[in-house]
Structures are given as structure tokens and as C-alpha cells.
Curated annotation (Swiss-Prot):
It is linked to Ritscher-Schinzel syndrome 3: A form of Ritscher-Schinzel syndrome, a developmental malformation syndrome characterized by cerebellar brain malformations, congenital heart defects, and craniofacial abnormalities. RTSC3 is an autosomal recessive form. Affected individuals show cranio-cerebello-cardiac anomalies, coloboma, microphthalmia, chondrodysplasia punctata, complicated skeletal malformations, periventricular nodular heterotopia and proteinuria. The chain crosses the membrane at residues 703-719. This is VPS35 endosomal protein-sorting factor-like. It comes from the Eukaryota. Residues 53-69 have a biased composition (Low complexity).
Amino acid sequence: MAVFPWHSRNRNYKAEFASCRLEAVPLEFGDYHPLKPITVTESKTKKVNRKGSTSSTSSSSSSSVVDPLSSVLDGTDPLSMFAATADPAALAAAMDSSRRKRDRDDNSVVGSDFEPWTNKRGEILARYTTTEKLSINLFMGSEKGKAGTATLAMSEKVRTRLEELDDFEEGSQKELLNLTQQDYVNRIEELNQSLKDAWASDQKVKALKIVIQCSKLLSDTSVIQFYPSKFVLITDILDTFGKLVYERIFSMCVDSRSVLPDHFSPENANDTAKETCLNWFFKIASIRELIPRFYVEASILKCNKFLSKTGISECLPRLTCMIRGIGDPLVSVYARAYLCRVGMEVAPHLKETLNKNFFDFLLTFKQIHGDTVQNQLVVQGVELPSYLPLYPPAMDWIFQCISYHAPEALLTEMMERCKKLGNNALLLNSVMSAFRAEFIATRSMDFIGMIKECDESGFPKHLLFRSLGLNLALADPPESDRLQILNEAWKVITKLKNPQDYINCAEVWVEYTCKHFTKREVNTVLADVIKHMTPDRAFEDSYPQLQLIIKKVIAHFHDFSVLFSVEKFLPFLDMFQKESVRVEVCKCIMDAFIKHQQEPTKDPVILNALLHVCKTMHDSVNALTLEDEKRMLSYLINGFIKMVSFGRDFEQQLSFYVESRSMFCNLEPVLVQLIHSVNRLAMETRKVMKGNHSRKTAAFVRACVAYCFITIPSLAGIFTRLNLYLHSGQVALANQCLSQADAFFKAAISLVPEVPKMINIDGKMRPSESFLLEFLCNFFSTLLIVPDHPEHGVLFLVRELLNVIQDYTWEDNSDEKIRIYTCVLHLLSAMSQETYLYHIDKVDSNDSLYGGDSKFLAENNKLCETVMAQILEHLKTLAKDEALKRQSSLGLSFFNSILAHGDLRNNKLNQLSVNLWHLAQRHGCADTRTMVKTLEYIKKQSKQPDMTHLTELALRLPLQTRT
């Protein structure tokens, strides 16, 4: 291809902008406007006549502002019309019936405010463990009764089933001894799986035998410390069995013609289901031992729904009375807990049975301190303080069930009954754990009096004060009692010698102190904690509780000037000696500061404290720190930096940024934030001075620019550095620091050759060329207004950049280099205009410096011709079959560039554009729709006064037809 000269067309930017502006259309009042609130008319319609095609309606309308999606409803929707035609009396009756049904359902279903058993299960298993050896009886199975004829009479079948059960009770089992706790748990899991397998293979009697065997284990208290966990494991099997039986009977009521509703009555159940249900209850009734008979029947209690409406309400009192026959108080209380659990699942409205369980328990409560239990504890070598904590899981559950939506009078009666019993610390603790926090809080002084009267043997008072503190964290006591409550509690807590007992109580009461008192009281509490936890480095064993204390304090003190004026707060932080814990605490503090600090601050107390906190976080970073952790720490430190403002004292602000740079040099995102902050500071200075810098402010902005220039090279990310060089150069230019701006731009140009072929983006390696193209396009936009340095040649920076682009090693099949050259052509065309498209205030760009000088324009055109030659040479290399589509696309792109920026009155340039048009279509690779729209645009432009020469060009641009 021949060499083509370049001639830029003269642009009148103001006229072009005016021609592109959208036409302003006056909007009359009442017309639609996208930001106008939408109103929907709600029509209440009364139907008068349905005959014929005409019907009259009367409606009243009301308008309201609603969401845009509602605007599609115009008038009355069909459902409203049906509702309007309904008979009012029938409608009222239906609504009343629905309301009664809903109220009934509300009483028969436990709400989400009731804490389920599953929440407590994991805690019990984790807490009640043992290292002693355990034993278990495993069911070995029996072959008796499997052979027989199908013609056996019903009575013989029943006899056979009973014999099978007798066979089980007579010894078809194997006792495994000396099991560890984990072995025991594994065996229980095996039994659970055996139950499911037996059921799936239709061996119902075997399944029942397994459940009976498991239930018997609940009468064994030989390893008493493990009993609560054993109860959880065994009742899981019972729950599985109860669910299998219920679903089996329920499935019998479902056939292809009918489906049993969720709230069915016994009349809905068929005879087969009822007979099967009775059969299960008869089998269970034949179990001789009390404990397995009780547990297995309780597990299928829900099946009574198939037999009678009153079945459950009749069975619950009977089962409650059965528990009276269990002599061991621990076994008895857990049996009551299971019955309450099943009762709450199937009939939560039957409160009488729950209450009866509680009052029966109170009658037998003194057994806990009786001789039988004491002798058992002596045999097992268990002390009373270790024995009594076995009761709370069961007692707390019973109390929770009873107190759920219970009237105030019942709770008061229960509290009074507990008060009358001697040695009632255990009861009192369960009352405070299960009753509503509001109930406890309003009677705080009464409970403190009861706690004082408790005998401390077996159940220490500090645990009672801890339970009271947990309630007071949720509900407020009477204002007049608050200080006295704190004093009474802290008298007991501060006397505790054991650091673990002390911190477990103190952690709870810190929240009460923060909630209701000032920093003076909080400081006193923190000082007491430091006093108790410092000796023998006791704090090392209590980091979780100490962390909770910090979280509670910062949750209630959102004013950080007040928080850091608490004298003992920072010494409290010094107890966190373990680095990982200390960093977590610092993260909590910074997170709270970012969330709750509303206004920027310059308070020296806050700044010094938080700089120390941030420094602690920063210094924890090492070579093994994960990227996610670095991001989190950087986010928190950046949040702090953004909230520091010294107002108009810009020099102090810059000093803070200098100090921060020295403290946080290992976190790149923090350094990036500091550079942005300093650039913003320079621009704020410019804004204050309205662009007219004094000698002092000029020196200050140069200091800001120098800060950025020094900091950027320390960053690792190459595109981060490139973009910050560009951004900082723009800031320097805006503040008339021309030599510093040149230094930034030169640094950016010298960095381009270092851009690697692939870069890491979010953990994935991606080609870098598209990112480089984006950066260079932004750079070109800035270079338009950068004035030439008087000691260097014309367009020195552009020439340097072109040399770098030329020498850069591009991908073999990449066209990014040519796209960049096309952008350079746009830049040079803009530089040749008499007046540039945009300027920086008080900075003379080349249009002012050269004033359209012919030498400058000649140099500019020469560069354009060089760039064009590079583009045309690349197009020539794409004449291969596999690259024809790329050639077509690039050719059309270059054509559009010439059309937009070139002076097509020049014959050679005009001919080049025609050649490019033909090249784009030569091999049928062009997008016809794009070509058509381009030609339409040319014809439209040709109608403008100074663009008539495009008419002739349009005639020379044929459209390729496809046949």
C-alpha cells in the first residue's frame, strides 16, 4: 500500500455538542414523568345487576402512593370483584370460623419463640462426658417365631408375638463391657441403624425389640456423669421409632381416592389404620418393665390421634403417674423431661399435664439429698457438686415447657413453691434459666434474697448470680433497684478465688453494668477483672470470656472518646498476650469504630489508641498470612484512615498520613488508600485557594505530590502503580506542578515495558493486554492537555510512549497494538485543533503554547503518518484466510477513525477511506447491518454545511450484496 498523508479535519466542538444535545420538550402539568410518584386508584365496587351485558356499579376511590409494580392494576382486579359479589353474612361467618380455627391452631402449634430441643442436644453431648468404661446390651436376634403357616388364628399370632417379646427379655442379648465413650456412641448408632434396617425389611417386632432394649439402658446409672448424654442418644432412637410408626399408620389412611389432611380427626382414619395402631399399643402394654414401657409408649404418643380425639389428653396424665414408680430421682426427672418434650410436640395446649409433672417433681425433689442417692454417689466416688449439675438439662426443659406462654399467676405460684423447699439452689437456677427474662428482671431483688438464703453445698451461689445476670442482660430491672442489684451481685463475684468461676460470672455482669451505668462503674468492673485475672497469668485460660467482655463494652459505648477515656480499657487489652486473640480483639474494636463513628475525628485520645490497635493488626501480617485476612485488615485500617480529619489543618493531616505510611507499610491496600487520601488533600487545598495558590500552599501541594511519588514505587501491583502514577500526575497538573506531573507521566511510560503478559486477577491468571489498552486510552486523554516541556522536543511524552508501544512484545494473534495506534491517531488529531476539547484551569496546553504553529502541526502530521503506516502494515499481514475476519473488523474501525477525525477533502485520504471500505467487505466478513448504518450516517452528515464533500464519498462506497 502507498504512503498516505494525514490531514486532520477542523472541529468546532461547541457546535458539535449543541447538535448532539437532546431536544428539550416542555412537560405540561399532569403529563407522565418517570420520577413522578405513581398513584393507584382502589375501587370498592358494589354489583347491582348481572343480567344482560350491562351492569351498573357504584364505587368509591382512594389514591395512595405505591410501588411501580402496582401501577399495572387499573381499576378493580378480578378477585376484588368476586369478593364484592359475595354474601356479606356468609363472608362474616366464614371469617369468624377462620379466625377461631386460627386461634385454635395457634394454641396447638409451638411458635418460633420456643427454643427447640435440637438446640440443646449438642450442648448436652459436649458437656456431659466421661473417661470411665461403659457397658451396653446388644440385641442378638432370635429365630423363634419366624417359621409358621399363613393360616394361624389371630389369637395364635398374638401369642406368638408375645413369645417373641418374652424371648427378648429372657436373654437374646449380649452384654458388652469396658467400652469407651466413643465406642458406646458407635454402638448406639449401630442400634439406630439396625432399627431403620429392620423397619425397612418389614421386621416390625425386631424393631420394637431394639427400642425396648435401648429404653432399658435409661435405667442404668452406673456411670452417672454420662447419663444426660446417654439420654440424648437413646431418645434419638425413640424419636426415630415414633416417627416410623406414625408414618406407617398415616400411610394406611392414604389411597388413590383420598388424602388424609394435616389436621385430621379419628373419623378420617380407616379401620385398618386403627387396628394397626391398637396393635402397637397392645404390644407396648405387654412390656413388663416400667421404664421401657413408659418410654416406648411416650415415643408413639402421637398415634393416639388415629384412635380418639381425647386419646392424647387421656394418655398424658397416665404416663405422668407412671413416672411416680421410678425410684431414682435422676432417671425420674429425665423421664419427665421426655414426656414434656413429646407433649409439647403433639399437644402443647394441654398445660395441665406439664404442670402436674412439675408439681410431682417438687414432691420428690428432697430425694436428691436423701440417703439412697448419697450412698449411690459414695459407691461411684462422685461428689455432690458434680452430681447436681446433671439435673439442669432436664429441669430447664421442664421449666421451659411449663413457662411457655404461661400466665403470670402460674409463674408466681411456681416460684413460691420453689422458695418453700429447702436446698433449692438447683431449682432456683432452673427457674431463672427457663422463665421469661422480664418476669425475672422485675423480681430481681426477690431472687437475690432467695439466692442469699440458699445452702451453698452442692450448687454454688455464683452460678445463681450468673443465671440472674443472663436474664438482666435481656430485660431491665426497676430503675430504683439497679445499683443495689449490681452491688449485691459483685459482692459475691469479687470474692471468688477460682479465676474460671470468677470470669464466667464477671463476663455476664459486665453487660448489665455497661447497659445501666456510666464509664465510672464500667472502669471499676474492668479494674476488678484485671486484678483477678493477672495473677499467675490466669487470663491465658480465659481468652473467650475476656473477648466477650470487650465485645459487650464496645457494643454499648459507641462514643469512642468516652470509651478510650475509661482508664482501665487499654490495660485490659494488654491481657491479650496471644497474638491471634489480640488481633481478633483489635478487629472487633475497629469494626465497631467503622460502624458507629458518624463524624470524622481528630481527637488525640482516639487517634493514639486506634493507631496502636491498627499497628497491632498490621504487625501480625507475615509471609503465611492469607490474602483474605490481609484484605480484612486493610479494610479496617482504611476505614480508620478515612475517618480521620483535621479540618482546615492540612499540614497536620499530611503529617498523619506520613506517620500512617511508616506504620502500615506491609499492607498494599492501605498504601493505596494513603496515596488517594493525599491526592484528595491536595485537591481540597486547591479548592480552598480556588486554584490561586500562595507560596505556602504551593509548597504544601508539592509536598503532597512528593509523598505520592515516593510511595508509589513501593507497591507490588503493576497496574496499581500505573493508575496511581496517572492519577497523581493529573492532581499535580491541576495544582500547576508541571515538572512533577511530567515526572509522574515519565515514570508511567517507563513502567509500561514491565507489564507482564499474564496477571493475577482474583486468583486467576488472565492476559494483561486489555488492561494495558484501557490504561493507555486514559493516559492519552490526559496527554492532550499536558503542555510540552520547553527543554524537550515537540510532543516529547507522546513520542516516548509511542517508542515504548512499538518495542513492547505483543501477543502474536493480538490486534491490541493497532487499537492503541488508532487511539493515538485520535489523540494527535485532537492535538492539531486550534482549541482543545477541554483544559485544566490555569494550565496552558499546547493549543495556547503553539497557537496553531505550522511547525507543530507538521510534526503532528508526521507522527500521524507514522502511526497510519503501522496500522496499514498490520492490515496487510492479516491477508491470510484465518485472519480475514480480523482484517475486516480492523479495516472498518480504521475507516471510522478517518471518517471522524480526518479531512476527507484530501484526495489521498479520501481514496484511503474508499480502499478501507472495500477491504472490510472484500471477503464477505463484514457485518452488513453495521455497514448499512455507517453509510446512512455518512449520508446524514453530508447534509451539514461544511460536510458536503461526504456526498461524493457516499457514492463511492458500495454495499456488498450476498446471494
